[in-house]
Amino acid sequence: MVCQHNDELEALVKKAKKVTDKGEVASYIPALAKADKHDLSVAIYYSNNVCLSAGDVEKTFTLQSISKVLSLALVLMEYGKDKVFSYVGQEPTGDPFNSIIKLETVNPSKPLNPMINAGALVVTSLIRGRTVKERLDYLLSFIRRLTNNQEITYCREVAESEYSTSMINRAMCYYMKQYGIFEDDVEAVMDLYTKQCAIEMNSLDLAKIGSVFALNGRHPETGEQVISKDVARICKTFMVTCGMYNASGEFAIKVGIPAKSGVSGGIMGISPYDFGIGIFGPALDEKGNSIAGVKLLEIMSEMYRLSIF
């Protein structure tokens, strides 16, 4: 499906782009450091299958932490919330997404929530399959149904770049393994997790996933109930409380919609029952969120009264 370019949306993108100079691309993952910090694109996918866009919405990017919502949805449907939340908590944290502090001081046997790296690693370790390839294929199959795009795959360069530099995540895995949180081989989990984070798509694909969540798990194009209603509700709740790293509270006040960001500069936003939003803007603020993407959502929320609060 081709998005319709929208002049009003383009004007908002132009306005939001002014803050890109204040941000920086993620340099600690070498492959992400190549991005153009001045890029900004947005697609809005409505429940009636109308799509509006501004900027270069065909440009692809990797999901990074946005993938945490999708792996969580998959394992919740596979095992149920009681089992999943016996491994990972449900409470927000004010710490950075890669912090190990709360894991050490609050509850060594359970990461606080699935949106921080420690919790996401545990969730990824629960994905069904005997090998990394089987588990990745299972996740990719799910994401292809969410996007209605069979071409979705992962970026090998980004995955390899992350795998070779993710020492803090490895440390978390070994720390949690010490406490029996998961029994998997650490390198196998790291291999799967870095490939999960490197799953690649464009703003339209991401907006389409957002629209599935907006419709409580039903795909607007195919009509398939891809995610159960209860799991969609749980995931949207986590996006409100933990989706924008340790800026989630401020984002809830200024924008007020469920959203999930990633350090590639992607943001998935959800206007319940109405539409999904896919944004790509690789210049990040100090919290790791797309600086122009957040600004664009602030403008849109104020103009179109998007806040759910």
From Swiss-Prot:
Keywords: Hydrolase. Pfam families: Glutaminase. Its EC number is 3.5.1.2. Disulfide bonds: none annotated. InterPro entries: Beta-lactam/transpept-like (IPR012338), Glutaminase (IPR015868). Gene3D superfamilies: DD-peptidase/beta-lactamase superfamily (3.40.710.10). One of its GO terms (biological process) is glutamate biosynthetic process. It catalyses: L-glutamine + H2O = L-glutamate + NH4(+). One of its GO terms (molecular function) is glutaminase activity. It is an enzyme of class 3 (hydrolase). Substrate binds at S65, N117, E162, N169, Y193, Y245, V263. Belongs to the glutaminase family. Homotetramer. PANTHER family: GLUTAMINASE. This is Glutaminase 2.
